[in-house]
């Protein structure tokens, strides 16, 4: 334990570590959460040209949007959808531009495009919610089921795989509960989902020198070696890397959740994620989905930390270690679209290379003839990869230093 605390203090004393933590906090919490809520994503539109043209009034807009949605709150039925669309069209006809921003029009419009494609008028430049006849918006859940079946067939997910996904989907409670959806859509679709990508960069910078840096200045390690041995020092470094990973995650996640609670509160936590993407099969509400996404990031970050520390132990150069570490995450992201679908799914199992938003998709893996829903593997395989790398990091570094 003494070795661990010494290594932990040594890591946090480094100026580069403090700078990285500060930059990561500013980028993700200040810009990605607080300013996103207050300005970029939810500030009322001013010039309609960019997020930077928005007014600095996101808190008020969010509260007004939540209040407006409550007038339709409860079960999402055909009548509810018709009322939402009719109310939007009436406000548009009355020229209530500011009031329109408080509606869930983007979400509702996506529902219309998914479930009622035959009502789309290609000659009309307006969005569907502006011109569609509300009385024709019937059979919401029947149409959703039909669209889901068609999607699975087009995706080649038939037979046993289709039935497997239907078994998962049957656990989704219907009718759906409805409140303001747009906030949760932004939160789960980008704010939380992007945390892993952001952490990967700064973890790579900090942890790449954890072992490799000792080749440039190993005086303190040499002193400790006379009493403890390289293996124990290596283990202390591994524990330090893991501790830093968890500490960075906790700082970002807790701060982000506090920001979320301030701006959004807890309203809508029990809505199903199907309100965001209708053909999602996961039987999750918004809160469960958020918890999953944070777990995905934490376990993925631990897995990535294990890989970075292994590379750092095996490579003497800090810069090369950093480049190789970042290539592990960002490389698959850059080449995935050029690869067969099966390889794309395999690359998603690399720590932080996949996406927590897979809970909105219908991806599966077949392992030894057994179908497994992809979100299960996306939170288990990455952390296992990292854990498997750690003993090799200890052995590799100890062997190199002894030599």
Region annotations inferred by a language model:
Residues 1-23:
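N-terminal Sec/SRP start-transfer signal
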Residues 5-7, 11, 310-314, 381-403:
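Junction motif at the cytosolic side of a transmembrane helix
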Residues 18, 231, 318-320:
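Residues that define the loop-to-transmembrane-helix transition and helix capping
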Residues 21-25, 319-332, 350-351:
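Central hydrophobic cores of alpha-helical transmembrane segments
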Residues 26-83, 133-214, 235-314, 318, ...:
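Secretory targeting signals
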Residues 217-221:
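Hydrophobic transmembrane alpha-helix segments characteristic of membrane transport
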Residues 224-230:
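Short helix-to-coil transition segments within interhelical loops
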Residues 343-364:
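Short hydrophobic, aromatic-rich alpha-helical segments embedded in or entering the lipid bilayer
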